[in-house]
Amino acid sequence: MVDRLANSEANTRRISIVENCFGAAGQPLTIPGRVLIGEGVLTKLCRKKPKARQFFLFNDILVYGNIVIQKKKYNKQHIIPLENVTIDSIKDEGDLRNGWLIKTPTKSFAVYAATATEKSEWMNHINKCVTDLLSKSGKTPSNEHAAVWVPDSEATVCMRCQKAKFTPVNRRHHCRKCGFVVCGPCSEKRFLLPSQSSKPVRICDFCYDLLSAGDMATCQPARSDSYSQSLKSPLNDMSDDDDDDDSSD
């Protein structure tokens, strides 16, 4: 069915509409064989708080951006190759329901749908697209994924030293290896993580010691079930600001 739709006028028109919504700042999305499978608003768990984002699922990429005017204008376009994507379901917790992880070697994050049915449909479609892509290319699924960042609101003190309290002066930082929220003194070192950046990135002392010793796997904790015992406020509707988790700290 996907192959049949690839060259259809309707598919070309739909993709063109998405391109126009992102404007000149967005990347071209129309290429031979690409099909727009579906689209919708998902709540993305960003660094500061959950935020509504517009997502577009194609047969080879996942695209999302900030909502400026619903169905008319989006910005801050992000493009994720599906062949690098792995997804895992997340248990419901408080106001955060119907969620799953989107994991890639460069960036991983949690998203939440409005209903359980919508979640199931998204996950099924993503899994099918990934399976079809890998089958055609003969590649194997990626087993290396960037850590999902712990939201700022989950940590009032450094998650490594357990002593430093965060204030407007004593800022929060994120370890790029484990995703923990840490203080400056606990994250002064940098390490080259090629899948995330061509330059050395900030990591905590704990991960630095393990990486320096060659113990790559121990740095990254398993966090597929819980994100937010402290995120008790209702989900935020919309925001036109940047993704907070794209910041340098």
UniProtKB/Swiss-Prot annotation:
Main location: membrane
Occurrences of domain PH (ranges): 35-131
Gene Ontology CC entries for this record: early endosome; early endosome membrane; endoplasmic reticulum; transport vesicle
MF annotations from Gene Ontology: phosphatidylinositol binding; zinc ion binding
Residue numbers bearing the Phosphoserine modification: S16, S239, S248
Domain notes: The PH and FYVE domains may be important for TNF-induced localization to the endoplasmic reticulum and for enhanced cellular sensitivity to TNF-induced apoptosis. The FYVE domain is important for binding to the endosomal membrane.
Organism of derivation: Homo sapiens (Human)
Gene that produces this protein: PLEKHF2
Function: May play a role in early endosome fusion upstream of RAB5, hence regulating receptor trafficking and fluid-phase transport. Enhances cellular sensitivity to TNF-induced apoptosis.
Location in the cell: Early endosome membrane; Endoplasmic reticulum
Stretches the record annotates as Disordered: 221-249
Subunit structure: May interact with EEA1.
Zinc finger (FYVE-type): 152-212
Stated name of the protein: Pleckstrin homology domain-containing family F member 2
Record has Acetylation as a keyword: yes
